Amino acid sequence: MSEKHLFTSESVSEGHPDKVADQISDAILDAILAQDPHAHVACETVVYTGTVNVFGEISTSAYVDIAHVVRETIKKIGYTDSENGFDYKSVGVHVSLVEQSSDIAQGVNEAEEVRDKNGQLVDPLDLIGAGDQGMMFGFATNETAEYMPLAISLSHKLVKKLADLRKSGEISYLRPDAKSQVTVEYDDNGKAKRIDTVVISTQHAASARNEEIHDDVINKVIKAVIPAELLDDETKYFINPTGRFVIGGPQGDSGLTGRKIIVDTYGGYAPHGGGAFSGKDATKVDRSASYAARYVAKNIVAAGLAEKAQIQLSYAIGVATPTSINVDTFGTGKVSDDELLAAIRKVFDLRPAGIIQMLDLLRPIYGQTAAYGHFGRTDVELPWEQTDKVEELKSVLGK
């Protein structure tokens, strides 16, 4: 008997301590960009019992009341009562922010391509150099309507549903911290066949009974989110498997910006270059180039040029032009990967300034990405999720 082909991804809710930190960092970024679109921001946050520490490097003309932004973010998440172990009204906020290193700023503000021109006129999109070296990945698949792998798509939707039920008051005992995990079984052709296992752990009031939690999560969350045809009598459910989850959020664990990078992206289905997103402005290619790579991959798949596509980009600090672009369609392409690469070079400008212009990234749009994933979102409008390059790609490839 052959083994099942299983793949698992997880997600966490907005009340998870690492996600609290991400949301604070991105809320600060947005508040700065609202006043100063060209600010350089690298903002990190640590949260733990009763305390928030904000630190990093910021160069801006804006004035932002950091403590106020922190408290409003915590309030919006739902930590509004000391009973939950973390309260926006009483939490201590400590801020330690300095200006961006002049050595880094030199390469970002004037790319190597410009510095080598000896005062000659240059392409304005060569002006911004990459904020660091590194490699970034983008991925898309036709496995779901949002062009995301099924396991991470469902994992996000499960914790988002928990949050919606909590905020609406429909399930009054729910608290902000939660995690989900979905295991998908694939057939021999790599097509999603069924859901093998669902794990959900949700923080709850001390008065809630395990039987009540189990029934509500099964019926009001899992069965409301996962299509019935993917669930069967063999599907396994683990609901709060420790038996109790009253102590949660930053009271239960410390949280740090950038510690949920797989949740933020493709749930482990595609590689990750290692750089986190939250708290970083668009000159940081960890963030902007990852968005651009997703944009490229999604448009390729949406155009019907491949069933799945993976894009790798790499950069050198202070240099505008990518040091490499790699395309892999895993044998599903309707044209060769080399042809796709040539088309990408014609259709997409992948220099940092080109990405910023193409995706309009100098706006305060980042807070909405800091929970429930940066990709495949259908509840918010994100520029890198648009499929507006489909026709241009087809035209370049003669399709």
From Swiss-Prot:
Q: Which GO terms describe its molecular function?
A: ATP binding; magnesium ion binding; methionine adenosyltransferase activity
- Pfam (any one): S-AdoMet_synt_N
**Pathway this chain belongs to:** Amino-acid biosynthesis; S-adenosyl-L-methionine biosynthesis; S-adenosyl-L-methionine from L-methionine: step 1/1
Q: Where in the cell is it found?
A: Cytoplasm
Reactions catalysed:
L-methionine + ATP + H2O = S-adenosyl-L-methionine + phosphate + diphosphate
Q: Does the keyword Nucleotide-binding apply?
A: yes
Q: Which residues bind K(+)?
A: E44
* Record text on cofactor binding: Binds 2 divalent ions per subunit. Binds 1 potassium ion per subunit.
Q: Which UniProt keywords apply?
A: ATP-binding, Cytoplasm, Magnesium, Metal-binding, Nucleotide-binding, One-carbon metabolism, Potassium, Transferase
- Transmembrane stretches, start-end: none
Q: Which cofactor does it need?
A: Mg(2+); K(+)
EC number(s) per entry: 2.5.1.6
Give the enzyme's main class according to its UniProt record, as a single word: transferase
Q: Where is this region: Flexible loop?
A: 100-110
Write out the residues that bind ATP: H16, D177, A178, K179, R244, F245, D253, R259, K260, A276, K280
Instruction: Summarize where Mg(2+) binds, as residue positions.
Output: D18
Record's GO cellular component, any one? Answer: cytoplasm
Q: Does the keyword Repeat apply?
A: no
GO BP annotations of the record are: one-carbon metabolic process; S-adenosylmethionine biosynthetic process
Record-listed L-methionine binding positions: E57, Q100, D253, K284
Assembly, per entry? Homotetramer; dimer of dimers.
HAMAP family to which the protein is assigned, alphabetical:
S_AdoMet_synth1
Q: Which family does it belong to?
A: Belongs to the AdoMet synthase family.
Q: What is this protein called in UniProt?
A: S-adenosylmethionine synthase
- Tell me the lineage of the source organism: Bacteria, Bacillati, Bacillota, Bacilli, Lactobacillales
The gene name on file is metK
